[in-house]
UniProtKB/Swiss-Prot annotation:
Keywords: Glycoprotein, Hydrolase, Metal-binding, Protease, Secreted, Signal, Zinc. Its main location: secreted. InterPro entries: Bact_exopeptidase_dim_dom (IPR036264), Peptidase_M20 (IPR002933), Peptidase_M20_dimer (IPR011650), Peptidase_M20A (IPR050072). Its cofactor is Zn(2+). SUPFAM superfamilies: Bacterial exopeptidase dimerisation domain, Zn-dependent exopeptidases. Zn(2+) 1 binds at D163, E196. Belongs to the peptidase M20A family. This is Probable carboxypeptidase HCBG_00059. It comes from Ajellomyces capsulatus (strain G186AR / H82 / ATCC MYA-2454 / RMSCC 2432) (Darling's disease fungus). Pfam families: M20_dimer (PF07687), Peptidase_M20 (PF01546).
């Protein structure tokens, strides 16, 4: 019997003496014993969990990198941990220095990691994921399963345990396992920074000499939380800002000014509905595969005080594009804004084009996986593939453990079982890539 179960039984046994009129001192003794037994049970669970994690190369690697904080623009420490691990396990490693994002004051000397077996600097198969996380850092911790103990149901919690250090750890172990059996397989690893902040790391790799024309690689396996399913594609991503200009005045005499907020509200109302309006009526496109295009007015600013007519207002909008091109979507949005404001010159719209991309279709020609279509974005479109004139076209796969539904939240977590299954999934994708030649 587990000590925790014994504690529960002891707790239940205190009810009968009370009903029989026993003195409260008996209850105090029983409660004291309950606390002691519960503490012993917790200690026993912690010792068991520690042994399970420490005895597994996969779980111990995952713990090592999850215990290192690596919020975007602060990835050098986890990068060094991975460089050390990969070097100790037979990989040649290169650091690809990546400047921090312009909107961050970090002084971190961060880098992408490019790794390959000694003597194979141009691998045919690349497994890649990201080593940065969203803020805030949440400490790594373990939770024993409820009821009968099942190793697979141990829960691993903390920032990055899912997105995407689970993929990083599982990829490495899968690669090491394959190389142990087939040491001549040209297998490489690419771990990038800043995926969570616009994909700076992948853009840096894409623009580097390692991304050749034609490519020396024929398969890319990307790691993100996909519930152990193979992703057949994800929506496109488009962002834009709307600004309104007004004239400030005392709120008691609003006719002396012009409200920027009143100017922007009908525009935002129109924007908010663009995903629900048919294209023929001026809406954004939908598709059978990705569903409807969705828009999120994520930030809205305006005004100085409640008793002042606002002279400025602005909004930032994110679009998850289900079909069509970026240019078409921008034109639809521009027309919708112009119609909503009657062509007012007080309204302006801007697009940060460098971060926009259309829907991304991915390869799924490997048997044995359930398929999934996702709404979230990745840095897959940030890697330009120069295979236009090549006889062999590059395959792109997206797979990983955990679910995106908890990935950025306070309860980010996955089970030991899912993490271990991911190693088998990546191994299956590697095997398929090897068969391609």
């Amino acid at each position: 019997m587990k000590l925790s179960n014994l504690a529960a039984l002891l707790s239940a046994s205190t009810v009968a003496p009370v009903a029989a009129g026993y003195v409260s001192q008996d209850i105090i003794r029983a409660d004291t014993m309950n606390v002691a037994v519960a503490a012993a049970a917790n200690a026993q669970d912690e010792d068991l969990l520690e042994k399970i994690i420490s005895s597994s190369p996969l779980l111990s690697l995952h713990r090592t990198i999850c215990q290192v904080e690596s919020v975007s623009n602060h990835e050098s420490a986890v990068g060094e941990a991975l460089i050390k691990y990969l070097g100790e396990n037979g990989f040649a490693t290169e650091k690809q220095m990546v400047p921090v994002d312009e909107d961050d004051d970090s002084t971190d000397k961060r880098f992408n990691i490019w790794a390959y077996p000694e003597g194979s600097p141009k691998p045919k198969i690349i497994l890649t994921s990201h080593i940065d996380t969203v803020p805030p850092h949440i400490d790594y911790n373990l939770q024993a399963p409820e009821g009968d103990f099942d190793r697979a149901n141990i829960t691993i919690k903390g920032r990055g345990t899912v997105d995407a250090k689970a993929s990083v750890a599982a990829m490495i172990i899968a690669a090491l396992g394959h190389l142990k059996e087939h040491p001549d397989v040209p297998l490489g690893l690419l771990f990038v920074v800043s995926e969570e902040k616009g994909g700076t790391g992948m853009v840096h790799f894409s623009d580097s000499d390692l991304n050749t024309t034609p490519p020396f690689f024929h398969t890319l396996i990307f790691g993100e939380p996909t519930e152990l399913k193979l992703v057949d594609g994800h929506k496109g991503n488009l962002r834009f800002d709307v600004e309104a200009r007004g004239v400030s005045a005392h709120s008691g005499y609003p006719w002396l000014g012009h409200s920027a907020i009143s100017e922007i509200l009908p525009v935002l109302e129109r924007i908010d509905k663009l995903g629900d309006i048919p294209v023929k009526d001026g809406g954004l496109p939908a598709s059978e595969k990705y569903g409807r295009t969705t828009l999120n007015i994520g930030m809205l600013k305006g005004g100085a005080a409640g008793n002042v007519v606002p002279e400025s207002a602005s909004a930032s909008v994110a679009v998850r594009l289900a079909a069509g091109t970026i240019e078409d979507a921008q034109n639809i949005i521009r027309k919708a804004v112009a119609d909503a404001c009657g062509g007012s010159k007080n309204i302006t719209i801007t697009f940060p084009d460098s971060k926009a991309y259309p829907p991304v279709d991915l390869d799924t020609d490997v048997d044995g996986f359930e398929l999934l279509t996702v709404n979230y974005g990745t840095d897959i479109p940030k890697l330009d593939i120069h295979d236009e004139d090549s006889d062999v076209k590059v395959k792109r796969y997206l797979y990983g453990p955990g679910t995106i539904l908890v990935a950025h939240g306070a309860d980010e977590a996955l089970t030991v079982g899912d993490l271990e299954k991911a190693v088998k999934g990546y191994a299956k994708l590697i095997d398929a890539a090897v068969r391609r030649g």
